[in-house]
Amino acid sequence: MNSKIPEDLMERAYQGKCTKEDALQLLEVPPFELFRFADELRDLAVGDTVTYVVNRNINFTSRCVGTCGFCAFRTNNGKVLSIEEIMEKVRDAEKANATEVCIQGGLLPEVGLDFYQGIAEAIKAEFPEMHIHSFSPMEVYHASRISEIPVKEALRRLKRSGLDTMPGTAAEILSDRVRKIICPSKLKTAEWVEVVRQAHAAGIPTTATMMYGHVETREERIDHMLIIRDIQKETGGITEFVPLPFMPYNNPVGEKMIREGRYATPGLEDLKIYAVSRILFHGHVDNIQASWVKLGKKLAQFSLHCGTNDLGGTLMEESISRSAGACHGEMITVDELEWMIHGAGRIPKERTTLYRRVELASGNLRKISGCGAYE
């Protein structure tokens, strides 16, 4: 079959050496040809297994001193959950067989690192096997400044308190031009990169995200992915890449877009982003996650033929996307996730945060084991 993707570009992709120019060229390829190539690389990287994690999101407060123009979750006077209230949610997660809790919240002027350490220590004291995937680079940076300690020391203390991995959120688009418009008080690009590098050095793996579809250019999207790839080449500490389409509702950035006649990214554009992500990250980051909360379940399912291999988590609650207009729910059952995966002709496997497989053992107790590409 004749391909509209140049052979030399395909060869660079197989070798994990695609350039910015290659990525921009791929965006011009007929969509289904692009999807076929991304799907081929997905097969080479991880095979036909599609993973998911049983987890719970816990947002401990909507109060925030930040000024992010894309956020519909922030309030000036929202409740701050106590550690005991957080633990009640963790207990519910444990009863639901969750292996992970993902805890994040707004930036509080009076809350330093001790609060975050206290959360981690309380969880590990009661549930030592529960994986704590929590506290964004922005939260760690903010808490370190409140506590007047270096980020490196903050991460060391969090690791000692029980933090296992860190979500690579607050990345948005790693372009200072973009960040000045949508989140002027947030970490600059170099600061975000440094927090993530320091986390990896401290033995705390992270994910990496990209929130696209607002004021950024195509070139800035590709630059963002290449920054993430460069970090991975250096540290090897990134477990997955998660493209997140911007929800342009109930927030200033989105309201301005809509006044200008621009809306959420079309589904075809979302799928092209996932496909190009797979191609750019081939040989570097094996796991490309589709967010069913952002995409909707059917488009997330279809993305499994466009380069993705993971559908994220059961979540149990999801306040941030919902407040910005996402309408696809905030909880999904394991049965429905596996139904979606089977419906795409793939093999479902529950995983841990670090992409190890979770299996049923005798007596219905679960054990964690290595699983090929997920290790």
UniProtKB/Swiss-Prot annotation:
Residues 50-284 form the Radical SAM core domain. Its EC number is 2.5.1.147. Gene3D superfamilies: Aldolase class I. It catalyses: 5-amino-6-(D-ribitylamino)uracil + L-tyrosine + S-adenosyl-L-methionine = 5-amino-5-(4-hydroxybenzyl)-6-(D-ribitylimino)-5,6-dihydrouracil + 2-iminoacetate + 5'-deoxyadenosine + L-methionine + H(+). [4Fe-4S] cluster binds at residues 64, 68, 71. Keywords: 4Fe-4S, Iron, Iron-sulfur, Metal-binding, S-adenosyl-L-methionine, Transferase. Its cofactor is [4Fe-4S] cluster. InterPro entries: Aldolase_TIM, CofH/MnqC-like_C, CofH_family, Elp3/MiaA/NifB-like_rSAM, F420, FO_synthase_su2, rSAM. SMART domains: Elp3. It comes from the Archaea. The keyword Signal does not apply. GO terms for molecular function: 4 iron, 4 sulfur cluster binding; 5-amino-6-(D-ribitylamino)uracil--L-tyrosine 4-hydroxyphenyl transferase activity; 7,8-didemethyl-8-hydroxy-5-deazariboflavin synthase activity; iron ion binding. Binds 1 [4Fe-4S] cluster. The cluster is coordinated with 3 cysteines and an exchangeable S-adenosyl-L-methionine. Belongs to the radical SAM superfamily. CofH family. Consists of two subunits, CofG and CofH. Catalyzes the radical-mediated synthesis of 5-amino-5-(4-hydroxybenzyl)-6-(D-ribitylimino)-5,6-dihydrouracil from 5-amino-6-(D-ribitylamino)uracil and L-tyrosine. This is 5-amino-6-(D-ribitylamino)uracil--L-tyrosine 4-hydroxyphenyl transferase 1. It comes from Methanosarcina acetivorans (strain ATCC 35395 / DSM 2834 / JCM 12185 / C2A).
